[in-house]
């Protein structure tokens, strides 16, 4: 297989293709502008097609029903001042942490000057995820960590860009649909 996506300009760098590949044939490589794109190692690729199946650029967009749209405002003015978007992330993640769940989200790594996704089950870790980053985050091996937590029956909250959330959703839908077939 030559490439995962049909059009590189539509690739969001969600890493679903990299994580779903059973042959570890895909690596995420930075372009000149620092954006991560999947590159296939043709020597490892077995043309199974899983990467194309999970790639959201190969999917038709579905309409959003009004019933699936929600509005949040955190009822805590102190926390709202520390948050973005009305504190929805804080409100939802508080419940996850209270239920001994885990949160996956983006932090800005000051030492390496980049945004990365991490896992946390503590308030301080969650607080590091708050605020807007406005750059692509490196999702690394988060998919396997999410999978392990789900297998351990932990409540999981995944946050990221819409493209990253869709990538995670497609990955788990494909993974568990494939296993059941």
Task: Indicate residue ranges for each PLM-predicted region.
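Flanking helices and flexible, charged tails adjoining ferredoxin-like Fe-S electron-transfer domains
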Residues: 1, 43-152
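Active-site catalytic pocket residues across diverse enzymes, especially alpha/beta-hydrolases
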Residues: 96, 172-175
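A short acidic (Asp/Glu
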Residues: 116, 167-171
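Conserved small/polar residues in nucleotide/adenosyl-binding loops
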Residues: 176-181
């Amino acid at each position: 297989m030559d490439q995962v996506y049909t059009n590189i300009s539509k690739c969001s760098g969600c890493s679903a293709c990299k994580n779903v590949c059973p042959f570890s044939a895909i690596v995420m490589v930075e372009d000149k502008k620092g954006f991560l794109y999947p590159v296939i190692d043709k020597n490892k690729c077995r043309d199974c097609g899983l990467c194309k199946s999970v790639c959201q650029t190969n999917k038709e967009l579905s309409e959003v029903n009004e019933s699936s749209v929600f509005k949040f405002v955190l009822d805590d003015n102190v926390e709202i001042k520390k948050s973005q978007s009305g504190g929805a992330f804080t409100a939802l993640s508080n419940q996850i942490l209270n239920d001994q769940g885990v949160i996956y989200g983006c932090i800005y790594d000051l030492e390496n000057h980049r945004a990365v996704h991490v896992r946390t089950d503590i308030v301080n870790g969650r607080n590091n995820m708050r605020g807007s980053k406005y750059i692509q985050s490196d999702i690394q091996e988060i998919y396997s960590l999410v999978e392990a937590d789900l297998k351990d029956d932990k409540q999981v909250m995944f946050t990221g860009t819409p493209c990253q959330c869709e990538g995670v959703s497609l990955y788990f839908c494909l993974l568990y649909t494939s296993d059941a077939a």
